[in-house]
Amino acid sequence: MKTTLRAAAAALCLAASAGAAASAATATWPTKPITLVVGYTAGGSVDLVARTIAPELGKRLGQSVVIENLGGAGGTIGAAKVVKAEADGYTLLMGSGSEVSIARLTNPAVRYDGEKDLAPVTFVGTQPMVLVGKPGLPAKNAAELITLARAQPGKLSYASSGVGTPLNLAGELIKQQGKVEITHVPYKGASAMATDLLGGQIDLAVMVLSSALPHIQANRVQAYGVTGAKRSPVAPNVPALAETPALKGVDMGVWFGLMGPASLPRPVVERLNTEMQAVLAMPEVKKKLAEAGVEVTPANPAQFGGFIRRETGRYRTIVQTAGIQQ
């Protein structure tokens, strides 16, 4: 009996020591560089957001924040690395809706659950998408486009950057809201998609607004509307699709946020969020993100978590209705 009690006491002491060590590590965090994983190659929207924020975040934390690009599989390789990483605050993710919420709804091979396996830290903001049409398409605005599409079901085509991407889901949401049948043509990149749109090989495309804007401003394409609930400050002359009665339920953007492994210690989450809020309030950071079409709307961990749950629910409805599967 005494031996059992001694063993139990030793176990309790060991647990207490481990807990104290963990608390001490959290209190002094960070003591070394932090890796910020981006699940895409350099040069894309998520990478741009990460590289805009990382230097300033590093200054405030007193440690370097190093970008690690792990491109491939729609961002899921990078997200999976963070899911499996030690929850010590030294491996973080600049996440987006694609790998955090959409991937597991469209791809059975994705084993993690972004809602449960990643800890929301700070919501950064959204980047609007826009529906554009090829030169000469006989529809001057979104209302006329819906009329045209209804008159010839399945004849019009729209392009996106791939099956299961936010651009694809936005296109399907437009179809569902407008009660039209438009054929989806997936592309592997925005460049090829824009080339074929300008050449008239496809009728419509859902693009990130910042990518489409030069073509819109040069009158090379017709802009039918942004996919957000209201007009974008980047292109105030482009209407929101939701301004058209048949499309009033269209409200979607490409979103970005800082995340970590699910069991990231609360003090680390709070410190990161505090410093992120300060970084996102910096005029130079806001200016650079705005130039890329990112509308900064920072939110705390609880708000960000609620946003992810709501968006995942919306994505699920779109995916199931459209039958999207990779």
Model features per residue range: what roles?
Residues 24-116, 155, 179-206, 215, ...:
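N-terminal (or domain-start) structured segment
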Residues 100-109, 168, 173-177, 204-238:
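A ligand-binding cleft/hinge motif common to bilobed small-molecule-binding domains
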Residues 31-33, 176-177, 217-218, 243, ...:
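An extracytoplasmic/periplasmic, membrane-proximal ligand-sensing/linker region
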Residues 84-90, 105-192, 241-246, 255-288:
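Hinge/capping helix and adjacent helix->loop/strand transition within the periplasmic-binding protein
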Residues 93-96, 160, 225-226:
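Short beta-strand segments
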Residues 1-31, 143, 326:
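Short, low-complexity disordered leader/linker segments with a strong preference
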Residues 45-49, 53, 57, 78, ...:
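Stable alpha-helical elements in mature extracytoplasmic
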